[in-house]
Amino acid sequence: MAQDRMTQLRDFATRYTAAWCGQDAGNVSKFFAPSGSLTINGGTPSVGRSAITQAAQGFMTAFPDLKVSMDDLVEKQGKILYHWTLEGTHGETGRRVRISGFESWRIGEDGLIAESFGNFDAADLERQIKGADS
């Protein structure tokens, strides 16, 4: 049964990845419970689909050709760890970026993300946007 759960979660994560690549922030938010939350790098949580749509749109606006790939998906201590890589061109500077990070999901009874805590190296992203080599 655990294998079936991971198969279902991997399918869910694959569709979530495609939603990010589809440049439709509202579609990304549909993977969250109506009162779900997304917290990025310990910041203020985006709570509810409208707020999550706005958060996703921020990335999509900053990187109009954004592509996300799923690097790994594991279950650990009751959480689902979704590891990803984002590649894209920063809209204002024209600089290409590539960052990796992860989200720690708590999946609700409805099969949607109830809570997501995301993390990536924001300083590295800023260096790439500014064009610094180190």
Predicted region positions:
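Short secondary-structure boundary/capping elements
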Residues: W20-Q23, A51, V97
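Secondary-structure boundary/capping motif
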Residues: V47-G48, T93
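Short, low-complexity N-terminal intrinsically disordered segments enriched in polar/charged residues
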Residues: M1-P34, A132-S134
